[in-house]
Amino acid sequence: LAVLREYSCNAVDAHTEAGVNRPIEVTLPSRLSLELKIRDYGMGLSEQDIQEIYAFYGESTKRKSNSLIGQLGLGSKSAFAYGDNFVINSFHNGVKTTYNAYIDPSQIGQIAKLASASSNEANGVEIVISVKPSDCETFVSTARTLFTHFKVKPIVRGVADFTYETRTPLY
């Protein structure tokens, strides 16, 4: 599933940009919790960054570096290929801000700021996507294959006994 790949690679890029060596965190969906969560510990995003990156197709902050995976400005919108909304939690300079990215009635992507509060959490971004019950196992099997290729393996939560396939890392 593209959403898992795109947001996980964006999280890896956020760590690369910020010089962070810790793994990204991924919570896989299960029948008990129908949410996919991908959390990075990069620099976080300001409100202006959120609007520019998530609301406009082709907008990318990564074109000036060859060390980053993404550069086309499409991956941050990939959740719209799966559903009509998703949540963005940005942890930026001591503030957690929650946004809802959604497709409006005219089929245009919009960003709504839902809440903002002081936070002691480390900077970064968390993407939360509601998942169909029938897709839970597909996300788990996709994660097993995808994350095998990551040099720094993500911390995976949400499922018991998660194991990676054995292959040579690409990222």
Features from the language model and the residues they span:
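Conserved ATP-binding N-box helix of the HATPase_c
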Residues: L1-E25, G75-Y82
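Hydrophobic (often cysteine-bearing) scaffold residues that line and stabilize catalytic clefts
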Residues: L4, S46, F139
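Solvent-exposed, well-ordered amphipathic alpha-helical segments
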Residues: S8, V12, L32-K37, N85, ...
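GHKL-type ATPase core
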Residues: S65-P169
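Alpha-helical scaffold elements adjacent to nucleotide-binding pockets in ATP/GTP-utilizing enzyme cores
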Residues: Y7, D49-F56, A81-Y82, T142-L146
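Conserved beta-strand-loop-beta-strand hairpin that lines the nucleotide-binding pocket
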Residues: V12-S65, Y99, P105-Q107
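A broad, low-specificity signal for short, low-complexity segments enriched in glycine/proline
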Residues: L1, S46-Q51, I88-H92
